[in-house]
Amino acid sequence: MTDPRETVPPGNSGEETIEEAFAWLDRTVEAINREAVNHLPRELIFQVWQRSWRYWHDEQGMSQSYTKYRYLCLMQKAVFIHFKRGCTCLGGGHGPGGWRPGPPPPPPPGLV
């Protein structure tokens, strides 16, 4: 069985291209979203995405990749704290929409 973790992130091996680094970032953001949606309210994920985009991209003028990177850092921290506080999801998550009843809000754009 192969190890699903990436052993060398982009920027450390000296062999990758910028396109490979962006592809790695996209894959990692999608992976954290797939995991976060099982543990955090979808509305929270959507708001973090929207506010990250609004602040880092629109107000600060940062690139899309930088905005995704900052979003990734925030989501990693949120998921870490969720697990650190004692996740009781038991692998099943909180169901669609997180802890809030009703239909889930739309996912972050481009991160379905």
From Swiss-Prot:
<dbReference type="GO" id="GO:0019058">
    <property type="term" value="P:viral life cycle"/>
</dbReference>
<keyword id="KW-1048">Host nucleus</keyword>
<keyword id="KW-1090">Inhibition of host innate immune response by virus</keyword>
<keyword id="KW-0014">AIDS</keyword>
<keyword id="KW-0946">Virion</keyword>
<comment type="function">
    <text>Plays a role in nuclear translocation of the viral pre-integration complex (PIC), thus is required for the virus to infect non-dividing cells. Targets specific host proteins for degradation by the 26S proteasome. Acts by associating with the cellular CUL4A-DDB1 E3 ligase complex through direct interaction with host VPRPB/DCAF-1. This change in the E3 ligase substrate specificity results in the degradation of host SAMHD1. In turn, SAMHD1 depletion allows viral replication in host myeloid cells by preventing SAMHD1-mediated hydrolysis of intracellular dNTPs necessary for reverse transcription.</text>
</comment>
<keyword id="KW-0899">Viral immunoevasion</keyword>
<dbReference type="GO" id="GO:0044423">
    <property type="term" value="C:virion component"/>
</dbReference>
<protein>
    <recommendedName>
        <fullName>Protein Vpx</fullName>
    </recommendedName>
</protein>
<dbReference type="InterPro" id="IPR000012">
    <property type="entry name" value="RetroV_VpR/X"/>
</dbReference>
<dbReference type="GO" id="GO:0052170">
    <property type="term" value="P:symbiont-mediated suppression of host innate immune response"/>
</dbReference>
<feature type="region of interest" description="Binds to human NUP153">
    <location>
        <begin position="61"/>
        <end position="80"/>
    </location>
</feature>
<dbReference type="InterPro" id="IPR053711">
    <property type="entry name" value="Lentiviral_Vpx_assoc_factor"/>
</dbReference>
<comment type="subunit">
    <text>Interacts with the P6 region of unprocessed GAG. Interacts with host VPRBP/DCAF1, leading to change substrate specificity of the CUL4A-DDB1 E3 ligase complex. Interacts with host NUP153.</text>
</comment>
<dbReference type="GO" id="GO:0042025">
    <property type="term" value="C:host cell nucleus"/>
</dbReference>
<dbReference type="Pfam" id="PF00522">
    <property type="entry name" value="VPR"/>
</dbReference>
<feature type="short sequence motif" description="Nuclear localization signal">
    <location>
        <begin position="65"/>
        <end position="72"/>
    </location>
</feature>
<keyword id="KW-0945">Host-virus interaction</keyword>
<comment type="similarity">
    <text>Belongs to the lentivirus VPX protein family.</text>
</comment>
